[in-house]
């Protein structure tokens, strides 16, 4: 199961600031950008590369690495909380093509939210995904019930990309298992796995509503 939990001291330091209810909007966004960049570098470790030889300014020749897949990246932004996260990913993958998906869960006021809640896609603009060539990165800071992500994955899997990556900051144990049991070939990168969901489908302990905290 390709689950990558990037729980290193720096990522956990940034995560702690994101969880803190006293972190203001500006610093919340900045920290999402920082984690996006770090997680992008972690993804780069799994991409295809070639051994190449170059000549230095001193006339010496030496071997190095050319990550060929850097030219074959598509990043999909799940609005709106993923915007700062994608900004960070683009620092790692400046040549990436970008797509945007707007999705919303169907809620009934005053009622508990089922874990298999309905989700509808209200906006979609995705560049052409080249089958077995492109590496698609789907960004969403929070994977709770995974209902939104599974809806987006229906769109992406049909295109048959080379690899599919999911980038999140916090994933619930329930959501991560649900995604990887249905799509065991997907690479899920997250900073931490949180154990619980409340009756509204939010992750506990979590960090609140990432979109509201980033943009108001």
Curated annotation (Swiss-Prot):
**The EC number(s) this enzyme carries:** 2.4.2.9
Q: GO biological process: what's one of them?
A: uracil salvage
Q: How does its activity get regulated?
A: Allosterically activated by GTP.
The molecular function terms in GO held by this entry are: GTP binding; magnesium ion binding; uracil phosphoribosyltransferase activity
Q: Where does uracil bind?
A: 203, 208-210
Essential cofactor(s): Mg(2+)
Question: Annotated pathway, please?
Answer: Pyrimidine metabolism; UMP biosynthesis via salvage pathway; UMP from uracil: step 1/1
Residues the entry annotates as binding GTP: 30-34
Q: Where are the transmembrane segments?
A: none
Q: Which reaction does it catalyse?
A: UMP + diphosphate = 5-phospho-alpha-D-ribose 1-diphosphate + uracil
Q: What SUPFAM superfamilies does the annotation carry? A: PRTase-like
Cofactor binding comment, as recorded: Binds 1 Mg(2+) ion per subunit. The magnesium is bound as Mg-PRPP.
Keywords attached to this Swiss-Prot or TrEMBL record, sorted alphabetically, are: Allosteric enzyme, Glycosyltransferase, GTP-binding, Magnesium, Nucleotide-binding, Transferase
Positions annotated to bind 5-phospho-alpha-D-ribose 1-diphosphate: 80, 105, 140-148, 209
Cite the HAMAP family for this sequence.
Upp_A
Protein task: Catalyzes the conversion of uracil and 5-phospho-alpha-D-ribose 1-diphosphate (PRPP) to UMP and diphosphate.
Q: Which family does it belong to?
A: Belongs to the UPRTase family.
Q: What is this protein called?
A: Uracil phosphoribosyltransferase
- Origin organism of this chain? Saccharolobus islandicus (strain L.S.2.15 / Lassen #1)
Quick one: which gene encodes this? upp
